[in-house]
Amino acid sequence: YIKLKNTYENYLFSCNYKEAKKTISKIEDKVGISLWSCGQKLILAEQEKGLEGNKRLLSQYLEVASKNRVLSALLEFFSYRAEEGTSLNNYNEKVDKFLKNFEEDEITFHYFSYKLQLQKIDFEDDMKYIFQIDCQFSAIDMYNSFIEVLQRAFANEIKVDELIWDRIKRVSFLIDDFRMNNLLAFRGEKVHPALKKNV
């Protein structure tokens, strides 16, 4: 997944949408459909076919996800975020309005704040909410959330248990992910020699 994801992002950033779509299809064939891959397809639909293509694909997703309120909401916001005409202010206003529906529901409020606003999180408290809801999605989504939570914790100087860092070091020998390697390098950890080129 990581190698294909890097390949996909290279195609996306170079505006080679045809190859980007092929790579997303390869990822889904090899490791399954994920919330991440659906979000990327919405971006590609917007770039290739404009707003109409974006909304057509969203409509197809919502038909399948109609009984899952969390999934439907995330897909709608991913679609909105992919729109070329969406400003950051408009996006944040829409998210703030949406979050008001969950002010009495701490778990859902924190989860959507994390997923939609990329807010600073309290590592100890919010991590359990994030993974509690993310566990209904794919392994890719769980993995991405884990890395993102660690990145934000590190950036905001939130202490992360040494046991977690030890596990990350072990995993870094198996998974060639530059995000994980960078976290270890910034901590002053020795990165596995075979992976140094990605730091």
Predicted regions and their residues:
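Alpha-helical segment of the N-proximal tetratricopeptide repeat
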Residues: I2-K22
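Start-of-helix register in tetratricopeptide repeats
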Residues: I2-K3, W36, R69-L74, T108
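Residue-level signature for tetratricopeptide repeat
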Residues: N6-N10, Q40-Q47, F77-G85, Y114-L118, ...
